[in-house]
A protein has these predicted regions:
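S-adenosyl-L-methionine
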Residues: 1-14
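Conserved acidic-Pro-Pro-aromatic motif
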Residues: 12-181
Length: 181
C-alpha cells in the first residue's frame, strides 16, 4: 500500500536551512528535477554530486551543460564499481578505511580524482556509453553470461571471472560531480 510523505523542493529546503556547501542528489530517477531547481537558487552549493542514468548519453550531457551554464566549471565522473576495488582511502582523521559495495565514495574534497573540464567529461561519458552497450548491465554480453548453456554463456562468464581476478570491474552505475568556479 502506498505511503504518503510530505516533500519539499530544493528552494524550500535552502530557505529553511541555508545553502549547503555540498549537495548529494540520489532520488532514483528524479535527480533531474533537483538539478533543474538549482537554477532557481540565488546561492548555489559549491559542489554537487548526482547519479547519472544509463539510458541516454544526450540526457547525461544535457545535465552537465545545465550545470556549466549555472557556473559549475569543473567535473568528475565517479565510476562506482571502481570504488569497491580501490585501495583503502585516508579518512579525514588520517585513518584508513574502505568503501562498502554500493557506496558513493569519499566526499569530493577527499577524492584523489582530479577535476576535469566539461569537454573531457563529455568524452568520458561517450566512451562509457559505448562500454554500456558492449558489456554493461543491459548488454548482450551480460545476457549471454546469464545463459545456462556452456556454449553461449561460457565465454562471457570466463571473461567476467578474468576481469574480477584482475579487479577490473565491468561498467556499473556512475555519479557525476560538479564544482562552482
Amino acid at each position: 500500500e502506498p505511503v504518503r510523505v510530505p516533500t519539499l523542493c530544493l528552494g524550500e529546503l535552502v530557505a529553511r536551512h541555508g545553502c549547503p556547501g555540498f549537495l548529494k542528489i540520489d532520488i532514483e530517477g528524479a535527480d533531474e528535477a533537483v538539478l533543474a531547481d538549482l537554477g532557481r537558487l540565488a546561492v548555489r552549493p559549491a559542489t554537487v554530486s548526482w547519479e547519472t542514468g544509463k539510458e541516454s548519453l544526450r540526457g547525461v550531457l544535457r545535465q552537465h551543460r545545465r550545470l556549466a551554464a549555472l557556473g559549475y566549471g569543473r567535473f568528475r565522473v565517479v565510476q562506482q564499481a571502481y570504488l569497491e576495488c580501490a585501495p583503502p582511502a585516508l579518512g579525514p582523521n588520517g585513518s584508513h578505511w574502505s568503501f562498502e559495495p554500493g557506496c558513493s565514495g569519499p566526499l569530493p574534497e577527499l577524492s584523489p580524482q582530479p577535476w576535469k573540464s566539461l569537454s573531457w567529461v563529455s568524452g568520458q561519458y561517450a566512451l562509457l556509453f559505448l562500454a554500456y552497450g558492449l558489456v554493461g548491465p543491459r548488454s548482450w554480453f551480460r545476457a549471454a553470461a546469464r545463459h545456462p548453456s556452456r556454449w553461449i554463456g561460457g565465454v562471457p562468464r570466463r571473461i567476467q571471472r578474468w576481469a574480477e581476478r584482475r579487479r577490473l570491474p565491468l561498467p556499473g552505475w556512475v555519479d557525476s560531480q560538479a564544482q562552482l568556479l
